[in-house]
Amino acid sequence: ELNQIIASQDLEIVVAAMVGIAGLKPVFQAIKHGKHILLANKESYVVAGEILNNLSKKTGATIFPIDSEHSAIHQCLMGVKNEESISRLILTGSGGPFLNRDINDFKNITPKEATAHPIWNMGDKISVDSSTMMNKCLEIIEAKWLFGFDDIDVLIHPEGIIHSLIEFKDKSLIAQLSIPDMKIPIAYGLGFP
């Protein structure tokens, strides 16, 4: 059973990459057992971020995001000495497959078009969420709980090279840039620290 595997003393890292709310119970169990969690299941933090954060403080579990945007924010924060100097977090999004489509033509959108993400190769649910920008809404909520910031904005960046930025009160920025390849944030998470 999954709970027994998660509780095992031999298990150090849990990769939580299941889709939807189904990820909440395994993420909760991994935190309960003090594991190092590579998190790609945003829904668990959207619905229970405060609870999961409080539990991780008690158990010593670490939550490391492996979504490209959240991994990028994590990397940017590593270079920040004073978080009070931060003005806002900026997540990027491609704008989805309909960014330049005439709004009057939206009624003709097909399911096949809605699942054809211009940058990332993803499953149908997250592709549809991305095509409607709903995925970005979920990522904003997740970022709030992962990083403790309320001022979070979105920048449409169709090329997918800039993954996230941090803006400081003096209006300077730091960003994480890379080719759009999920192997990069996953490898970073596996190798951190």
Positions of predicted regions on the chain:
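Catalytic, metal-anchored helix/loop core of enzyme active sites in primary metabolism
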Residues: 1-193
